[in-house]
């Protein structure tokens, strides 16, 4: 059996909304359906019934995104009922995992046309109450927020593994001696690059606003922020001597993204030129408390699989969960030219809707490669509980 080439024909995303912001009244299954429908509408020559499967990442899945949000999106988007859908969860890497699983299906001949993406509504993530082990327990019961982080943790897990995500970022800052000023400068650059990219219209080809919502661009970008403004923010996780703040970490967000993946036959049916080709991917594990450094080995492994090196990269979308985490990874890739990293801004400015982010990054790289005409691109994320995920694209 020969392995087929896998092409990205198109990629779309919503503007990313802030927690409690413009998209907070929109259900996650409706967000997912919106990008699926937009993707299909942008390839009118392709019969929607030809979509062999829809893969969607979703990190929480405890609320309106329960019971296979991918399948719900298919139905809500008006695709034929014959089109199936599957939801995958690799936490922050869920959207990229969906892209990788769709690519694998096409590569081995199980599919010719697939949609892959991700969704998250952190605003609408519910509170949950753990079911007691016996009826009528005495005392108070605890509600858990499903928006972010550890909950109902297994007591067998070592305490050092289950630290808060922000404390994990502080551990990376400790490991690489990253100052507050370095982290704030990285965050400022993220906002500046994102604002400039929007001003130049660089996101016009991939962002599809949600109808009826007054949101045309990413909601968390702060055009006028400064080092002075960022310096006024208090540490969020270590009151004494901490360096991680709300200003140098990604916010809580709502959004969705989707990509159209095809083989050669599917490409002919669309009648379109592909944005990029999927070349390789890799996933690795690391100590859970150092999750922020998860991309370090995943990126090296993905590049090795692709037969490429850091010098070959023309663009690199690295998810900015925290400035400390991103800077820690960059410190472990001395061969990498930092100028190719997040040229249009990153998650600190754009936002990090957990299950959608990996698909957003993959789509961003594909669009950047298409704009350049040729090159090698990379997308990577750190993942809570200690993993890293990376994807190599080429054009």
Regions found by a protein language model. Name each.
Residues 1-26, 148, 228-293, 297, ...:
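Condensing-enzyme catalytic core mediating Claisen C-C bond formation in acyl metabolism
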Residues 14, 24-25, 29-34, 45, ...:
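N-terminal extracellular/periplasmic Venus flytrap/periplasmic-binding protein-like
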Residues 24-114, 118-137, 207-217, 289-290, ...:
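Conserved beta-ketoacyl condensing-enzyme motif
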Residues 28-44, 69-73, 98, 165-172, ...:
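Short, well-ordered amphipathic alpha-helical segments that serve as non-catalytic structural scaffolds
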Residues 90-120, 173-202, 258-265, 331, ...:
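Active-site-proximal alpha-helical scaffold in enzymes
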Residues 113-171:
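Flexible glycine-/small-residue-enriched beta->alpha junction loops
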């Amino acid at each position: 059996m020969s392995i087929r080439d896998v092409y990205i024909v198109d990629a779309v995303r919503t503007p990313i909304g802030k927690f409690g912001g413009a998209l907070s009244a929109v259900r996650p299954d409706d967000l997912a359906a919106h990008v699926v429908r937009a993707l299909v509408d942008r390839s009118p020559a392709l019969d929607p019934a030809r979509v062999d499967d829809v893969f969607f990442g979703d990190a929480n899945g405890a609320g309106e995104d329960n019971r296979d949000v991918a399948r719900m999106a298919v139905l809500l988007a008006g695709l034929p009922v014959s089109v199936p859908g599957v939801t995958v969860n690799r936490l922050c890497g869920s959207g990229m995992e969906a892209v990788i699983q769709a690519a694998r299906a096409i590569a081995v001949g199980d599919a010719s046309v697939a949609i892959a993406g991700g969704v998250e509504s952190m605003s609408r993530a519910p509170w949950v109450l753990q079911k007691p082990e016996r009826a009528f327990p005495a005392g108070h019961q605890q509600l858990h927020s499903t928006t972010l982080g550890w909950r109902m943790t297994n007591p067998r897990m070592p305490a050092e593994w289950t630290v808060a995500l922000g404390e994990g970022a502080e551990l990376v800052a400790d490991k690489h001696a990253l100052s507050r000023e370095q982290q704030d400068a990285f965050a400022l650059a993220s906002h500046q690059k994102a604002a400039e990219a929007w001003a130049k219209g660089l996101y016009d080809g991939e962002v599809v606003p949600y109808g009826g919502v007054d949101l045309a661009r990413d909601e968390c970008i702060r055009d006028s922020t400064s080092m002075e403004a960022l310096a006024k923010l208090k540490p969020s996780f270590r009151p004494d001597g901490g360096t991680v703040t709300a200003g140098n970490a990604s916010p809580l967000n709502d959004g969705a993204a989707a990509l159209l993946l095809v083989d050669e036959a599917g490409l002919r049916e669309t009648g379109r030129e592909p944005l990029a080709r999927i070349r390789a991917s890799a996933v690795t594990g690391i100590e859970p408390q150092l999750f922020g450094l998860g991309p370090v080995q995943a990126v090296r492994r993905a590049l090795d699989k692709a037969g490429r090196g850091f010098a070959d990269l023309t663009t690199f979308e690295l998810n900015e969960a925290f400035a400390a985490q991103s800077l820690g990874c960059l410190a472990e890739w001395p061969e990498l030219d930092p100028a190719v990293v997040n040229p249009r801004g990153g998650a600190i400015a754009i936002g990090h809707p957990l299950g959608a982010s990996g698909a957003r990054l993959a789509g961003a790289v594909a669009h950047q490669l298409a704009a350049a005409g040729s090159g090698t691109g990379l997308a990577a994320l750190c993942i809570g509980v200690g993993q890293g995920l990376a994807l190599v694209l080429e054009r």
